[in-house]
């Protein structure tokens, strides 16, 4: 199991939390970015800078992440592509994406984009704060525990 981060859009505080959890649980972290980033100084962290281009980092994440992995991303269409591949997805504010909520999240994302395009609404989310950080830490802990438990169950099943 690996943790992937859509590094261009992920707040620094969330990246730091992922690294702490990965160190504690002995997991690999792959930060994928379209622009150069500062790599955290931990052996468990790898940084991949993809060629620039529309959705290049997203495409790399979808191609490389495997079922049972976790991707940290804010991008709803990316999360939808990952969920369809049985890859877990969590946003840096602690909201898990799954097959049950994906339709609603895509519809809400499209509505907000339309409202912004029409000038009916300002852009962007509120700044990343302590509540977001705590919600993310709690959700990350729960999700990693579940994914590691599921990976252990899969590993103990006889091959057919």
Swiss-Prot record:
InterPro entries the record matches: UPF0178
One of the Pfam families matching this protein, by short name: DUF188
Highest taxon of the lineage: Bacteria
Coiled coil: none
Protein family: Belongs to the UPF0178 family.
HAMAP family listed in its UniProt record: UPF0178
Protein name: UPF0178 protein PSPA7_5991
Protein species of origin: Pseudomonas paraeruginosa (strain DSM 24068 / PA7)
